[in-house]
Amino acid sequence: MTVEKLITDHIDIWSSALQTRSAAGRGSNGKIDLYGIKKLRELILELAVRGKLVPQDPNDEPASELLKRIAAEKAELVKQGKIKKQKPLPEISEDEKPFELPVGWEWVRLGDLGLIGSSSRVHQQDWKPDGIPFYRAREIVTLAKYGEVNNDLFISPELFESLCLNGLSPETNDIMLTGVGTIGVPYIVKPYDKFYFKDASVLIFKNTHAIYSEYLNKIFTSKYWKDEIHKYSMGTTVHTLTISRANEVLIPFASEQDQIGLVSKIDELMLLCDQLEQQSLSSLDAHQQLVETLLATLTDSQNTKELSDNWVRISQHFDTLFTTEASIDALKQTILQLAVMGKLVPQDPNDEPASELLKRIEQEKAQLVKEGKIKKQKPLPPVSDEEKPFELPVGWEWCRISDIAMFTTSGSRDWAKYYSEKGALFVTMGNLSKYSYDLRMDNLRYVTPPVEGEGLRTKLEPFDLVISITGDVGNLGLIPEGLGEAYINQHTCLLRLIPICHNYYFPEFMRSPMAKLQFNTPQRGIKNSFRLSDVEEIYLPLPPLEEQHRIADKVNEYLLICSHLKSCLQSAQQTRLHLADALTDAALN
């Protein structure tokens, strides 16, 4: 089977094998990794280095003849004093050869194909604001990826000329290799390049025998190369590629004609991968836009009938609409928005209206002030018509967080002296989440705080809401029953609602699009930050108390369905990943 046929016959597997990244990237599908296409690119390069990508021509001069000429040229350069005689590299044993090569190919150590070295030391005091660019590993990685780099380190032309006397300055068709960080990343030196490089951080392959540099470059981007250099790279937690290790890496060396044919075929197939990748990304973007547009018809519905009609339209295509994690996340956000708009459950005219609830809350707070349990709050202005984003159902009211809160507070800066190996839980931003109010318990810290003062003020109780107020503002954590003694740090706000509001409507509101929009509004300082007064001023739709419970139950029911959908989707995605892996293994073996 040709590689072209391998691509076209299984295009559904290559394009549908997706993986969710842990961190968001650029664009609406920045969190999606096109795993299948990535595996296809790896496969193309792996087939190439094994000599299985293009058929061999028995009339081609074998690689052994080319290697003889290279050895003769090297001996002549030593004789002329242009290069130093190298210590012979170890013979290649049969046990070392990782796979069988086609007839006419040879295994060779990289050091036998050219000269591998590093630069002369450039001291920090020699760095200049302009002059000849001075590249470290990070600049080589950027050059390899984009073909250009915005560099901020330079050396003087005079120093550059003196450093070039050692014969290891970059020249056209030499190959730079990163020695630290992401090791082994190659960059072919172009005719217009003029730069120097950091010793040990970057290695240079001096192409003294005019080997086809594009062929070596393809090998240096293959999985085979990455596996080989990491197998014996120095360092435990940090890998490095040394000159001695690079010298000894085995290279599958093709005949000159095969090298040219392979590079051409790889470029041709990578272009197909580029097209497939662009089509997949465009399809994912179009799908997500369609989902978001249709879901917007639900929140934009003007009445119950229109909402029902729009839902019927979506439900008829449920199995084709909600097929990605992003689309399911959008559905979750729509459910939460419908909930706070009063469109998720029907209103009951027999419910006590929210206006009466607010009166009761006001009376309860007045009593707590009288008993000295809370301080009297400064009254905030009512929610203005300009702030109200939509019309509320009958029986609902607009209010601010401060109207239903006993108090808000944040932790202090000097809690480091209370840190301990065990004791009370210290809730930090690392325990909060963006779209969930369940506390994260995978990154726990402990404190032994004072009994009075800060210890009393920042001690958490069940149903307290903890909110991040610096950096990634608006991340949440709801304190559950049975958590035990716990406190907050200075980057979080403790929001304690009046006991009558201890239900799940309010945590659901705090993770809704309406709340997130308010968290994203104030931008203060170098990092986004939120003051306690900003939290108190958050405006929200307040349903009757009985309806709050019905809404929370319905949200929980629907979000459980969404979680089940996502779980099924992830299982299906895992199957597609296994199929892509199996297809790759089958093609290689």
Residue ranges and their predicted role:
Residues 1-9, 32-34, 47-48, 99-108, ...:
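Proline-centric
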Residues 10, 17, 22-34, 41-43, ...:
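Non-catalytic DNA-recognition/assembly elements of restriction-modification systems
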Residues 4, 30-34, 60, 99-103, ...:
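Hydrophobic alpha-helical scaffolding
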Residues 91-96, 111-126, 140-172, 192, ...:
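Sequence-specific dsDNA recognition surfaces
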Residues 120-122, 141-155, 175-198, 212-218, ...:
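Short, ligand-facing micro-motifs at secondary-structure edges
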Residues 61-65, 288, 352-356, 366:
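Terminal amphipathic helices with adjacent charged low-complexity linkers/tails
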Residues 179, 195-203, 234-254, 469-472, ...:
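A short glycine-rich beta-alpha junction/loop motif
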